[in-house]
């Protein structure tokens, strides 16, 4: 009898189920999503006037190229979804038809929208739909998927977020390797307190406009599997 009880106690499946249904496991698998829905809905309602003004502002600044940017991104378990962001660059091209460098296409309005992180606000729609969470690893480009190591790929075990643990510790000013380590740390430590801490640090960084991009670049250098 004692041996049977010990076997049940050491059963990894039963332990994982218990962890999911208690403590922070319950937050991770139920309350986190509930908070995402409630907060994103209220935020969209409150911020609607701001979103409307920025939409019109960017439409004219982008010379008719539109105010929104939609792109395929991998979400939880690698499932592809359309991310929504404010468009901060024009579609201007050179004589051969190639897009001009990012630095030349980034408008003054777009630069302001980026530096204040306003460009991320439309992702509240993705959060409401369930594609994303308020807090989690940032959703990156689809072409990065085959470049991840097995450990780095663990970042897709949770929904991607508007902000995350990596954004609190350097954002675009740290290497990809460092960023992925921080992402995986978050996956292993999802909790209400961690998410509250991320929100607090994110607000402070946004107000200070800290760690927006690497010095001298409009966008961060792409991931190549080794950097």
Can you describe what each PLM-predicted range is?
Residues 1-27, 31:
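Flexible, Lys/Arg-rich cytosolic regulatory linkers and terminal tails that connect or flank
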Residues 30-33, 49, 105, 117-123, ...:
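An acidic site on a long C-lobe helix of protein kinase domains
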Residues 2-6, 22, 157-227:
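C-terminal terminal-structure detector
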Residues 4-11, 66-105, 163-181:
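Short, glycine-rich, amphipathic interfacial segments at transmembrane boundaries or analogous
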Residues 19-91, 198-227:
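A hydrophobic, helix-centered structural microdomain
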Residues 40, 69, 107-111, 143, ...:
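Positions in alpha-helical segments
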Residues 102-159, 199-202, 206:
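A short, structured surface patch at a secondary-structure boundary
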Residues 54, 68-69, 98, 135-137, ...:
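Short, hydrophobic secondary-structure boundary micro-motifs
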């Amino acid at each position: 009898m004692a041996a049977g009880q010990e076997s049940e106690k050491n059963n990894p499946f039963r332990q994982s189920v218990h962890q999911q249904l208690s403590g922070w496991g319950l937050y991770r698998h139920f309350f986190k999503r509930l908070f995402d829905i409630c907060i994103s809905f209220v935020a969209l309602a409150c911020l609607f006037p701001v979103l409307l003004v920025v939409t019109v502002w960017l439409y004219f600044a982008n010379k008719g190229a539109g105010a929104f940017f939609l792109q395929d991104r991998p979400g939880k378990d690698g499932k592809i979804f359309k991310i929504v962001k404010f468009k901060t660059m024009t579609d201007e091209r050179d004589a051969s038809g190639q897009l001009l460098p990012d630095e030349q296409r980034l408008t003054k309005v777009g630069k302001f929208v980026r530096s204040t992180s306003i460009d991320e606000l439309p992702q509240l729609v993705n959060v409401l739909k369930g594609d994303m969470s308020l807090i989690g690893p940032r959703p990156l480009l689809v072409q990065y998927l085959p470049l991840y190591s097995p450990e780095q790929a663990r970042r897709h075990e949770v929904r991607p977020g508007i902000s995350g643990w990596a954004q609190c510790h350097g954002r675009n000013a740290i290497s990809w390797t460092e960023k992925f380590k921080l992402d995986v740390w978050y996956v292993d430590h999802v909790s209400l307190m961690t998410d509250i801490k991320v929100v607090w640090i994110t607000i402070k960084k946004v107000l200070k406009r800290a760690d927006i991009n690497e010095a001298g670049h409009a966008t961060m250098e792409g991931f190549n599997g080794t950097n």
